[in-house]
Structures are given as C-alpha cells and as structure tokens.
C-alpha cells in the first residue's frame, strides 16, 4: 500500500480497515506512583501491554493496515499544568487513542473528554492529525472544556453543561450513529455532533452510559456481538441477529493512577471489546478461547475468522482492543444498512 494516502474515512466499525492509530506506553508515568509495590506491579502490567501492542502491530501489518503511533510526553515531576479550574501533574498515558479522538466521515474530532486527565492528550498525537489534515481530511474539536466544578453539582446540570464526549461514545453504522444515554456524551455534545454531522441520524441505545465499544460490536450488517439484550437496541435492529455474552463478573482492581487506568468498570464489558479488520476477520482477546469458547464458535459460525490477541493487562487498565486501536480509514460509505 505504498500509494495509500492517509485520509479519514469512517462510517462503520466493520468494513476493511486501511489505516489506524495504535497506542504507545508512556513508561515515565509509573513515577507518579509513590508506593513501591504498586509501582512495580503497574510496571509489570505496562510491560504486558507493550507485548500486546507488539502482537497487535504484527496483526495489523499482516492485513496491510497503515499504522501511526503517538509520541508520549515524558512525565516531569517539576512541572504542573495549571488551568483555571484544575491542575494536572502529568499528561494521560497514550495507550488508548480511541478515547480522545473520534474518527467519523472524513473528520477527526479531538473530543472534549469527560475526564480531566485527557485534557492535554492531543499533544501526543498532533503529528498524526497534521498529516491527515494536510492530505485533505477535516480536523475539528468541540468547545474547549472548562471542567468547572459547578457543572458536577447535580447530574441534570452536568447533562446540560458544556459539550462533553469521549470518542467511543459514538459508533457510526452507515448513515446512523449510535450514542449512549449519557455520562460519556451529554446533551450539548449530542447537539454539537448533530450540527457538525447532519448526514447522520444520531440514535440512542437504551440503558448505555459508557463507551459503546464495551457494550457491543457490530461484526457486519445484520450481526451484533453484544453484552446487552436485543430489546435495548433501537427498532432499526429488530431483524438483526445477536450473539449474546454475559458480563463477566470480577472484582475491579485498585486504581493506582487515573493517568494510567480507566475507572468506569460498571459500564464496561471487555469480553465484547474486539476489533474488526474486515467483515471476515475479528480480533478478540485470547482469554475468550479459555473462558468462553462457545462464544468464539458462535462468531465463527457466521463465517468470521477470530484472531486471538494476548491482553492480560486489560482488566487492570480497563482497556479493550478497540481502545488501543483507533481505525482512521475503512472502506465503508454513507450507506443505509436498514
């Protein structure tokens, strides 16, 4: 693919992927952790994650996917990032490029995340999006968030606060874009998206309050791999087939640093968080073969080849495969799949 020009093109999560951004470990962030034992086991988890990246990069290369990587900004204990309503001791680990950036249509959106720790994440990816922009892609952002504490004084007010959204809170499926009921995408964020992308019909998935990629994955038109029942999906999906998996019950690990971990365990089912290379190949966490082989067989019964990815650090980090790989270009177009 030497003649491939990097441009944003994303209307789904299942057609052939041509380019993507793969995360990178910022090793310096372990120095944020004062307790030696916690620092040591966090280091071990990050080493495991680095191996996961190596495996993921090989898979992507095998499928001729053009890959970019962020440039981690080293932690400096003598530096603080002071904003009017909060201050940061570091910049978030750039392990999950999908969290801070939404690729939709021909545009990359630098999102206004609900997490303060993500405020300066864009610095580590600027070289990537500049190249896409120079090649003709659009590059935008919602209003810069203030994270004024008053906005958290009661949930209703937060819901109508400044536009706040995370990248995985939007899942395009042709000419519609699925969104959650709230928390990681509030009402003003929905209005902002509708005005920026009028070609999409933004449709809410009932009972979802977190990143959609940890509730379900659309494997191909007519087929969903899901941890939520079919009745929660919009009526448009009533004739689609569902491969259902129960949410795995486990005790969430201790949060040692929000610059390294995601703490939304309540709204996350990592089992479903896989990545489609195309409609016939799906990357899935390796532990699924050990603990849920029947689910793997169900997916494969639909003509989809499942590719195992070792990801033992996923629970500690609360990150899945679609968190660490952000597809920037797929073959899909603005289609009506319904």
Mark where each language-model region is.
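The feature marks the mature, well-folded catalytic cores of soluble enzymes
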Residues: 1-338
